[in-house]
């Protein structure tokens, strides 16, 4: 073996062992072998590549393995080690080194070494290795299980809203709630239409054949895939049948037999790629691989066949269940090209991880790492370049052909070479199958219908366009007949008469013989892995996530320590006495505060659980594990942290405050605090499971706390709770915790050995008197009753959480919408099929008609790229010269010379031994972009395309930039550059609640100046310009459609791309950067977007686009190409030429570069011939070659020319930084905020509903309490009610505003970077927008509470109650906004905000009256906003009442005297309280504005 390696064959694609011939070499070993020769002398003969000594060594090892018991034999394999071979070679030994290994304990190094040797070039070595696996199986005559999926007369229908009724306004949402409530009792008001998604389709997906699913948008591809995988939403109506090997879906477990790979990537962001795949592999198990291996080994032993070591090791290693990290994972990582990022976290919105294309591959790998052989794959190539897509599909094709798997895959823009990998094609359009059968006959079918695919047109692109009414005519090829539109239904009928259709019909007419189905083909058990293994995997994953989220737990503990220290010093034992009832009530306040802090401590579980739910729901639907397997580790692994936090709290507070000194009472309180924490964690987990959405869960959690808090027995004693609410007292967990804590404390000797006189003058033990006065149970057994109650609630909440995970589905599914016009047309012609785009609907009716056709520039006829004319023909029936646009602009060029970009070296790379301080991402990039020239910026993933664009556009927020950048010869100044440039980001970031036209008007009004040259730019001219831009980008018929959230409501992906372009165009820029404008689009949508781009260029603007996997049409629509290689180096910069000829000539001139094949996509060919593997093969560096070329010298000359200003020109200059004045910016921002708030029911309706519920709850619980002022306890109850209402409504306002501000802040970063406005007008507009909504909220809250509690109806008192409540709600809302502004996201903001809730509570004056707060903490009382609120509410209502009340242990007093001396509230202080409340609101709003201006958490 070592001779092979030493002879220069290191580039050989794998290492294999031959089976049969004497003295095989490496190349011969990879040759395909006949699969029929089972056993015989041929199988027994062995030869070594290193001679007989090697063969003898291997034979001895194998003989030793054969003597082992069956179980051990299945776990033991022979491994040849490269390191040991090298050592032997150095020592002069002439034989190969082997060792026996336990495949369950293969080390990381051993696995990696094996993969490196066997799969050096993934797609090529994969085929060879799989061929050897297959040969081994065939040699002993084992038949692999196969699955044929058939569907007959499959029909799927949905019910959906019509027209504007679907828009998410406050009014529509209220109607939806009302209709849902009526629907529960059988009444179904409202207009809904039936949408037929699939119309009686029939077909078959066969094993060993790769099947491609094609179709235009909304044709039903995803629905078909879901239906075949048995994963259709239960709310959909389904007809027809789907069978696997003749078995219907109900007869076996479809989720285990087949896997649906979604087009959305849902993963745990904190886990690495390898950990994600390992967990998936452990949950899916190995299926029947072990049984197959056992039978294989038995037959080989009988036949005397000795398998190849590598093949044997691989099969054994991938057949072992319960391995933490499997060789199957390493294999999957390699064939998907994920091995380079295996140890990188996947990432999410909170943390940077792998790229979007890599995430897409992880989604695929998560399923193929398991034993499932039936795969339904939905658009798995989004975000991938064409060469990566080709590699992945090629590997999957090999698995299908050699492993007899069944795969149906939909792709958006498959390149011709990828298309050629498929055996069968299913073409779906308008819910009907137009063609299904061999790929070779698909063009023949359409030619029989009169349509022909053009020469330089990809077949897949042709197939997706030929059924479209807009695009069909250009493909008409029958010159003997005039063109007429052929409908989808007619195509479908013609296919049934086509020879392929007839064969399919014959195939389906013969039922599948169930007896032919392999017993291992289908899975009949929901659980394929043992419970023990699932628990091990789940515990390991949960522990890993806890370690990765350790910051949260450390932060929580530190926060708890701080609050404990504050509480200890507030209730310091030197200030705490046990003399009378007043002293006792202070202790009750300390116990109550302890209870509430530890209850609130569980709030973090809410957001942590919500973020995990999407991944859980995905795993649940795939039957990875039952729900309790997810919840058990979740609960158990939190217990140690809860114990630590409980110990910390009790140790810090117990003796410092001065609770009962007995040791047993210390440990009893510790137990109770622990149980309270466990109960709180269970409560918030259950809330998260029931609500399933962050905003709703925040409100639901606050609602649960409110009910438990109010009915816990401490705000309102049991005797005072109305009988209609008494049930709430018994189901409040806080009641059990409160009573248990109090009994534990007040039964101590220091309370029981002292006596006080009751109202009748009879002596009573102080502890008993205290408990009776506070309505606490006086039975000492209540400690254990309370502890048992808390334990019971803990178990109940966790069971409820588990049940919610079992039975509830995730929220926020896309809602199909039918426009008014489409519905009327369907009613008129009786067509049940409606064309649907999720949520793309006009607010005043239908807008689903295709976009109006565009005038084309006369410049097109002279274009050098013939791809342009074909591109423009898509969807266009008219053409003519474009008139000039209403606003002039100055064409500008951009040149850049030797641009370098560095970032600080990542810590992970430094840990791996990298010594440099900086990582270089761009290296000596030189080039230019010119007016009326469309430039493509290309390169493989990670080449630095977006990085270069960000650097040139000035969008980088970090790193180090070097080089010379000039605009028309003058040095680039970012402030002025932002005014004349536009940047279309890949992610299409827009405010979701405004319409298309409103988005454009908003951008135009902020970015267009008052004057261009001598021309005044009036508002009417701006509106006219907006209309022209909408026409240019074909959005005029979508002008009244809501933008919406991607994938949920609003515009389709392609429409959002065009909106992104339009938003930049209305700024009238001279230079436009576009990042991936066609990513995630099908061929037709990409063509529409590119036509928009081309139209933009033809107005004379400078446009640059990064692009991933262009079709031939799209690629040749560009004029020039700037190509980067990995490392950010230029390898080509120049013209494409007609049919890309100039670019092709450049690369073909390089020695060793293969010629382009006929009809091959030039973009794909270019990426392939310039890849890293090609550089290794040619032993050259393309970047160095380019730098020595004539092309480079020409570009240098051009850059030097463009770096000199033309005579008579001047540098860009604007008198102000922004186009609009500060007032103008504020007006525009306020206008958009108004629209956003009105159309945000999930925010405003939720908080309004919560406020209404709180008001009614408090009103019914504290019914007419204002008239029952007989004693001090009644007054304390009223104060408690007021404090509770303001605190909970305030906290809910704070929590619900955070996600809204966070979403809008993302848009703000884009708009501010574009130079639309400064931060202050934006922030002030958002602050002002809250005022009317909070006013409405306060108005109905005040009326309800004031009336039901029967406070005194005087104008002054009512006004003061309203005033204090209004500004309290307002400052809480602004406090929430401020916490977002100082945090990277709303999850961190929620934790930060919660940290101060406890302090607000403690110093509110409710738990400990102001006169009793130690002097060293009194300063914080005056800084606590909640304290001023309670002060204002109490003193305005009761500060002037002279009614006599009884006070326990003291003489009777007036209410005003008691309020002044017990609580420290002075009536004369009211003129100070009012402005202070206003100041708190102003302060938080001001801090929000300052932080949003100064802090930037966007890392680019």
Swiss-Prot record:
ABC transporter domain span: 182-455, 894-1151
Entries under SUPFAM superfamilies matching the protein: P-loop containing nucleoside triphosphate hydrolases (SSF52540)
Compositional bias of kind Polar residues: 837-846
Keywords per UniProt: ATP-binding, Membrane, Nucleotide-binding, Repeat, Transmembrane, Transmembrane helix, Transport
Compositional bias (Basic and acidic residues): 822-834
Annotated residues for binding of ATP 1: 215-222
CDD domains: ABCG_PDR_domain2
Organism the protein comes from: Oryza sativa subsp. japonica
Keyword Transmembrane helix: yes
Chain intervals for the UniProt region annotation (Disordered): 26-56, 822-850
Membrane-topology descriptor: Multi-pass membrane protein
Main location: membrane
Keyword match ATP-binding: yes
Pfam families, sorted: ABC2_membrane, ABC2_membrane_7, ABC_tran, ABC_trans_N, PDR_assoc
GO MF annotation list: ABC-type transporter activity; ATP binding; ATP hydrolysis activity
Subcellular location: Membrane
TM helices/strands, residue ranges: 551-571, 584-604, 639-659, 670-690, 695-715, 724-744, 783-803, 1245-1265, 1277-1297, 1331-1351, 1358-1378, 1388-1408, 1416-1436, 1472-1492
UniProt family annotation: Belongs to the ABC transporter superfamily. ABCG family. PDR (TC 3.A.1.205) subfamily.
Function: May be a general defense protein.
Gene Ontology cellular component terms for the protein in this record: membrane
The protein's name in its UniProt record: ABC transporter G family member 42
Residue ranges constituting the ABC transmembrane type-2 domain according to the UniProt record: 533-746, 1224-1438
């Amino acid at each position: 073996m070592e001779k092979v390696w030493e002879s220069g064959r290191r580039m050989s694609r794998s290492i294999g062992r031959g089976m049969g011939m004497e003295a095989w070499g490496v190349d011969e070993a990879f040759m395909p072998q006949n699969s029929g020769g089972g056993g015989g002398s041929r199988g027994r003969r062995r030869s070594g590549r290193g001679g007989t000594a090697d063969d003898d060594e291997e034979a001895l090892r194998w003989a030793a393995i054969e003597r082992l018991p069956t179980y051990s034999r299945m776990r033991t394999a022979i491994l040849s080690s490269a390191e040991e071979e090298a050592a032997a070679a150095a020592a002069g030994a002439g034989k190969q080194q082997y060792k026996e290994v336990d495949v369950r304990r293969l080390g990381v190094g051993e696995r990696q070494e094996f993969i490196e040797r066997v799969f050096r070039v993934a797609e090529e070595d994969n085929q060879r290795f799989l061929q050897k696996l297959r040969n081994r199986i065939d040699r002993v005559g084992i038949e692999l299980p196969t699955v044929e999926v058939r569907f007959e007369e499959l029909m799927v229908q949905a019910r959906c809203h019509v027209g504007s009724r679907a828009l998410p306004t406050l009014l529509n949402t209220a109607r939806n709630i009302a209709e849902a409530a009526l629907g529960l009792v059988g009444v179904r008001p409202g207009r809904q239409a039936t949408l037929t998604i699939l119309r009686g389709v029939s077909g078959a997906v066969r094993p060993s054949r790769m099947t491609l699913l094609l179709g235009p948008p909304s044709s039903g591809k995803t629905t078909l895939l879901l239906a075949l995988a048995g994963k259709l939403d239960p709310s959909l109506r389904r007809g027809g049948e789907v069978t696997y090997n003749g078995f219907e879906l109900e007869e076996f477990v479809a989720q285990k037999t087949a896997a649906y790979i979604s087009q959305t990537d849902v993963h745990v962001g904190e886990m690495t790629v390898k950990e994600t795949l390992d967990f998936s592999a452990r949950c899916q198990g190995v299926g029947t691989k072990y049984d197959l291996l056992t039978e294989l080994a038995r037959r080989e032993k009988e036949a005397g066949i000795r398998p190849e070591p590598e093949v044997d090791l691989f099969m054994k290693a991938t057949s072992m269940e319960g391995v933490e990290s499997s060789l199957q994972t390493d294999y999957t990582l390699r064939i998907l090209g994920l091995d380079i990022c295996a140890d990188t976290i996947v990432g999410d919105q909170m943390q940077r991880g792998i790229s979007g294309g890599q995430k897409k591959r992880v989604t695929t790998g998560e399923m193929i790492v398991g034993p499932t052989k039936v795969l339904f794959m939905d658009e798995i190539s989004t975000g991938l370049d064409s060469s990566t897509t080709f590699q992945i599909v090629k590997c999957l094709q090999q698995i299908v052909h050699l492993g007899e798997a069944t795969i149906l895959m939909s792709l958006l823009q498959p390149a011709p070479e990828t298309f050629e990998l498929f055996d069968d094609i299913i073409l779906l359009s308008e819910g009907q199958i137009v063609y299904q059968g061999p790929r070779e006959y698909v063009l023949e079918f359409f030619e029989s219908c009169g349509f022909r695919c053009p020469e330089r047109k990809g077949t897949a692109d042709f197939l997706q366009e030929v059924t479209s009414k807009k695009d069909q005519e250009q493909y008409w090829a029958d010159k003997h007949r005039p063109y007429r539109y052929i409908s989808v239904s007619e195509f479908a009928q013609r296919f049934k008469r086509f020879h392929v259709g007839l064969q399919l019909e014959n195939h389906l007419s013969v039922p599948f013989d169930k007896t032919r189905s392999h017993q291992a083909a289908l899975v009949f058990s929901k659980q394929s892995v043992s419970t023990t293994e699932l628990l091990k995997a789940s515990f390991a994953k949960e522990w890993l996530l806890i370690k990765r989220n350790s910051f949260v737990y450390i932060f929580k503990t530190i926060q708890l320590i701080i609050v404990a220290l504050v509480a200890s010093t507030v209730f310091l034992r030197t200030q705490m006495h046990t003399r009378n009832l007043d002293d006792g009530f202070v202790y009750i306040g300390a116990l109550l505060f302890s209870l509430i802090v530890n209850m609130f401590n569980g709030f973090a579980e809410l957001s942590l659980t919500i973020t995990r739910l999407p991944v859980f729901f995905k795993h649940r639907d795939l039957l990875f594990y039952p729900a309790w397997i997810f919840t058990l580790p979740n609960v158990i692994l939190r217990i140690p942290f809860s114990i630590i936090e409980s110990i910390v709290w009790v140790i810090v507070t117990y003796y410092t405050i001065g609770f009962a000194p007995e040791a047993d009472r210390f440990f009893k309180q510790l137990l109770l605090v622990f149980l309270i924490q466990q109960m709180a964690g269970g409560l918030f987990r259950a809330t998260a499971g029931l609500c399933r959405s962050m905003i709703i869960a925040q409100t639901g959690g606050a609602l649960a706390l409110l009910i438990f808090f109010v009915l816990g027995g401490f705000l309102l004693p049991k005797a005072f709770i109305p009988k209609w609410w008494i049930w709430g007292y018994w189901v409040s967990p806080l009641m059990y915790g409160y009573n248990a804590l109090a009994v534990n404390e007040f039964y101590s000797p220091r309370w029981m050995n002292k006596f006080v006189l009751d109202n009748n003058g009879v002596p009573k033990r102080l502890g008993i008197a205290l408990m009776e006065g506070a309505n606490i149970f006086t039975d000492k057994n209540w400690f254990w009753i309370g502890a048992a109650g808390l334990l019971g609630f803990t178990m109940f909440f966790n069971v409820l959480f588990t049940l919610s995970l079992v039975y509830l589905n995730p929220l926020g599914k896309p809602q199909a919408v039918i426009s008014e016009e489409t519905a009327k047309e369907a009613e008129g012609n009786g067509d049940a099929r409606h064309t649907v785009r999720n949520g793309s609907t006009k607010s005043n009716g239908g807008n689903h008609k295709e976009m109006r056709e565009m005038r084309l520039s006369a410049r097109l006829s002279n274009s050098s790229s013939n791809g342009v004319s074909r591109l423009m023909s898509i969807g266009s029936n008219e053409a003519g010269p474009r008139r000039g646009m209403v606003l002039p602009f100055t064409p500008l060029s951009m040149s850049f010379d030797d641009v370098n970009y560095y970032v600080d070296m990542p810590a992970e790379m430094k840990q791996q031994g990298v010594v440099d301080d900086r990582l270089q991402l761009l290296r000596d990039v030189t080039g230019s972009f010119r007016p009326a020239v469309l430039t493509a910026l290309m390169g493989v993933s990670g080449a630095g395309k977006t990085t270069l664009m960000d650097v040139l556009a000035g969008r980088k927020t970090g790193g180090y930039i070097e080089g010379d950048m000039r605009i028309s010869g003058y040095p680039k100044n970012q402030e002025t550059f932002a005014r004349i440039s536009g940047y279309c980001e890949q992610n299409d970031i827009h405010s979701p609640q405004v319409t298309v036209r409103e988005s454009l008007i908003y951008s135009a009004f902020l970015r267009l100046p008052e004057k261009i040259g001598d021309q005044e730019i009036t508002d009417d001219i701006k509106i006219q310009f907006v209309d022209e831009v909408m026409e240019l980008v074909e959005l005029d018929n979508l002008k009244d459609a809501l933008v919406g959230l991607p994938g949920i409501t609003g515009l389709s992906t392609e429409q959002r791309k065009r909106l992104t372009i339009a938003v930049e165009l209305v700024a009238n820029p001279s230079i436009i950067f576009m990042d991936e404008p066609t990513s995630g689009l099908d061929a037709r949508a990409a063509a529409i977007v590119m036509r928009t781009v081309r139209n933009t260029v033809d107005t004379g603007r400078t446009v640059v686009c990064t692009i991933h996997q262009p079709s031939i049409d799209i690629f040749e629509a560009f004029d020039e190409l700037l190509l980067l290689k990995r490392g950010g180096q230029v390898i080509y910069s120049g013209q494409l030429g007609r049919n890309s000829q100039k670019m092709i000539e450049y690369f073909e001139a390089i020695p060793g570069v293969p010629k382009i094949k006929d009809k091959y996509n030039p973009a794909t060919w270019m990426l392939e011939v310039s890849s890293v593997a090609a550089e290794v093969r040619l032993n050259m560096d393309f970047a160095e070659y380019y730098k020595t070329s004539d092309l480079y010298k020409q570009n240098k000359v051009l850059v030097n020319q463009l770096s000199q200003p033309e005579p008579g020109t001047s540098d860009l200059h604007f008198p102000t930084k922004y186009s609009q004045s500060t007032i103008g910016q504020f007006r525009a921002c306020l206008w958009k905020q108004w629209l956003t708030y009105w159309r945000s029911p999930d925010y405003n309706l939720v908080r309004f509903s919560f406020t209404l519920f709180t008001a009614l709850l408090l009103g019914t619980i504290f019914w007419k309490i204002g008239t029952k002022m007989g004693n001090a306890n009644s007054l304390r109850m009223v104060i408690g009610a007021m404090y509770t209402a303001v605190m909970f409504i305030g906290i809910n306002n704070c929590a619900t505003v955070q996600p809204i501000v966070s979403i809008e802040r993302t848009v703000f970063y884009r708009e501010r970077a574009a130079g639309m406005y400064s931060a202050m007008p934006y922030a002030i507009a958002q602050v002002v927008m809250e005022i009317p909504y909070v006013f409405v909220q306060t108005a109905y809250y005040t009326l309800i509470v004031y009336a039901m509690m029967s406070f005194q109806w005087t104008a002054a008192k009512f006004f003061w109650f309203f005033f204090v409540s209004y500004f309290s709600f307002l400052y809480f809302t602004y406090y929430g906004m401020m916490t977002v502004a100082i945090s990277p996201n709303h999850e961190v903001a929620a934790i930060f905000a919660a940290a101060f809730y406890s302090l607000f509570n403690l110093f509110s004056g409710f738990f400990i009256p102001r006169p009793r707060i130690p002097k060293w903490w009194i300063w914080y009382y005056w800084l606590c906003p909640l304290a001023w609120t309670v002060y204002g509410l109490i003193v305005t209502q009761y500060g002037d009442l002279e009614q006599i009340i009884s006070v326990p242990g003291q003489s009777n007093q007036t209410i005003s005297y008691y309020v002044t001396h017990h609580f420290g509230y002075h009536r004369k202080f009211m003129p100070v309280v009012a402005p202070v409340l206003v100041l708190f609101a102003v302060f938080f709003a001001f801090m929000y504005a300052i932080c949003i201006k100064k802090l930037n958490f966007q890392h680019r």
